[in-house]
Amino acid sequence: MTTISVVIPTLNEEQALGQTLANLPSSLVLEIILVDGDSTDHTQAVANAFCTATPNARIIRAPTGRARQMNEGAKASRGAVLLFLHADTQVPNDAPRIIESALTDPAVVGGRFDVRFDTCSGWGRIISTFMNWRSRTSGISTGDQGIFVRRHTFEQLGGFADIPLMEDIDFSRRLKRAGSTVALRQTVRTSFRRWEQQGPLRTILLMWTLRFLYWVGVTPHQLANWYQTVR
């Protein structure tokens, strides 16, 4: 069975992290690396408690920044396959089997899951349906879809670019050029909180604007400065 290393970057995620960790499949094929970016809440306490009770889990520290944290987690891991999860994203119980099956074709270098939100809201269903359709047609994945990749491919690509935004989009574009990728129909469950905080419509417009500006050449650092201003 393929060894899968799960890498979870954290920053002030005390409320969401516990549920994510509790729902990780209890499988010996999993190695769990929690990478904290200097949280100021109780995230590290939640992570430490989990690692104490889970032999194949450990926590490391890294400079704040999702791309940096994921890269450090990958360096610290040993698995032949890397699965990157957001701290508020839960995988299906049979995720290891699903990923291993997807990678039986040697031409496949990685992929992602479909996403659904932890809400009964109609907005949640509409947004997740569009996200999954867009990703399936474009081949571009976002971090909340549970991106997985063969280790040797990840290393050949140099990991995630050290940028403050769009690291998942940038990585997906490069991953597509490295080989075949799969868009799994099985779903991960992720939090709808980001959409609720500012309202679905406002968040949709913000995300579309950021993506458009990125595609036309605005740098992630410029986008990050603008994003902090308009939030």
Where are the predicted features?
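Cell-envelope/extracellular polymer assembly enzymes that use nucleotide-activated donors
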Residues: 3-5, 31, 170
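Hydrophobic helical membrane-anchoring modules
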Residues: 1, 173-231
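Short, well-formed alpha-helical segments that are part of the catalytic scaffolds
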Residues: 12-26
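Conserved donor NDP-sugar-binding/catalytic core segment of glycosyltransferases
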Residues: 94-122
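Conserved donor nucleotide-binding strand/loop of the catalytic core
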Residues: 30-33, 44-76
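Short aromatic/hydrophobic "clamp" motif used to bind/position activated sugar donors
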Residues: 82
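Acidic helix N-cap motif at the loop->helix transition within catalytic regions
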Residues: 15-19, 41-50
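A conserved acidic beta->alpha catalytic loop
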Residues: 36-45, 89
